[in-house]
Amino acid sequence: MITTERLILRPFTENDAADLFEYLHEPMVHCFFDMKISSMDEAKEDAVKRMENDCYFAIELKDTGKVIGEIFVHPDGEGMEEEDSEGGYSDDTYSPCWILNKDYHGKGYAYEAANAVFDYLFNEKGARRLYAYTEDYNIASQKLCEKLGMRQEGLFMEFISFVNDENGDPIYENTYQYAILKKEWDKCDK
């Protein structure tokens, strides 16, 4: 569990299903369309799946206990790591992504949560590099990446498709990649 001034970042519980449904029944960004939930039963199943995966952090408001979103932290190259000197695996690169209930946008919660998770990854998990993808139309997420000290590494044209047009053909999106190294994070004014 990670705590900030206003938030608790913690594993999901079954009791989070209603809040999960609230922000995933109509995702605003295409990359989350495959996570769309259509019923409370699906929300309960998804809450259990998130409970069983330590890559998910529920973003809970300290003062109300409401879950307003999540941060998912994917270890890069999962399953493809090179063995370390002791015969185990090490991974020093992570790809965080975040989604918040639209009613809580613009209040600094995404920054507060991501900042705390970045600090955790760099200082507790030994991360060397973090990177994030954001669609070219998602200006708020681009600004968040920049506020977190990330630099834009590139723009991938027609990189991925999450939706189809009326004929069933994929609509490809342009995607920015942002990244930050541990040594850059250490110099950031947090």
Predicted features and spans:
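Short, charged/polar low-complexity linear motifs in solvent-exposed/disordered segments
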Residues: I37-S39, V48-R50, S85-G88, Y131
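Acyl-donor (CoA/ACP) binding surface of acyl/acetyltransferases
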Residues: M1-C31, E60-K190
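A short helix-loop-beta-strand connector motif used in the catalytic cores of GNAT acetyltransferases and
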Residues: A47-E60, V67-G69
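Short linear motifs in intrinsically disordered
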Residues: T13-N15, D46-K49
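Conserved GNAT-fold acetyl-CoA-binding loop/helix
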Residues: M28-V48
